[in-house]
């Protein structure tokens, strides 16, 4: 398995890393996402949390993994946060919004982000097995898509990875 820790300072090759700016602008939302992830773990769900914010950093919605609780394979933190944001804003188009999430989104979540027309996604930990924002595939920046997102990766990576590692260690 590939270790993405500190590779390219958290970014894919060729992209500038703006850690100080990310930490200041997106850190508070990532802290909320990490709290949601910890709550998921406490409730027996894979620890993933997500927060949708607007350009001013105002929190629009939050979500956590609820697949087991709802018996719904689509109840990922990202999907639930996007649904809630759409309801709150009264639109399915979330232009100008950013999704902040503790784990690189999968293909399903990446597709939902494209359909929501988000401005960017900020995630903590890479998901080398199923990630669709740069590791396994890169659906959100595919030039063939009608919309593309900015991707910022690696913010609070160690904290997110620790939550995941602790969760799975308890189940082995």
Protein language model annotation of sequence segments:
Residues 1-43, 59, 108-172:
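Zinc-dependent deaminase
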Residues 33, 37-40, 50, 61, ...:
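Small-residue (primarily alanine) positions within well-ordered alpha-helices
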Residues 44-48, 95:
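Short, basic and Ser/Thr-rich N-terminal targeting/leader segments
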Residues 48-57:
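Short beta-strand scaffold segments in enzyme catalytic cores
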Residues 60-67:
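Short beta->alpha transition motifs characteristic of CBS
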Residues 69-80:
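A short, polar/charged loop-to-alpha-helix boundary motif
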Residues 91-103:
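Immediate flanking context of iron-sulfur cluster ligation sites
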């Amino acid at each position: 398995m590939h270790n993405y820790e500190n590779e390219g300072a958290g970014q894919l090759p060729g992209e500038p890393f703006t850690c100080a700016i990310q930490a200041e602008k997106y850190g508070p939302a990532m802290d909320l996402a990490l709290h949601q992830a910890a709550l998921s773990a406490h409730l027996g769900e894979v620890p993933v949390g997500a927060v949708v914010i607007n350009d001013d950093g105002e929190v629009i919605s939050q979500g956590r993994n609820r697949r087991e609780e709802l018996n719904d394979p689509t109840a990922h933190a990202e999907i639930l946060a996007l649904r809630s944001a759409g309801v709150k804003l009264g639109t399915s188009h979330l232009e100008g919004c950013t999704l902040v999430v503790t784990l690189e989104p999968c293909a399903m979540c990446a597709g939902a982000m494209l359909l929501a027309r988000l401005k960017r996604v900020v995630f903590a930990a890479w998901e080398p097995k199923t990630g669709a924002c740069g590791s396994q595939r890169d659906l959100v920046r595919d030039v063939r898509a009608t919309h593309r997102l900015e991707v910022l990766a690696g913010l609070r990576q160690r904290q997110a990875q620790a939550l995941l590692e602790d969760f799975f260690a308890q189940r082995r």
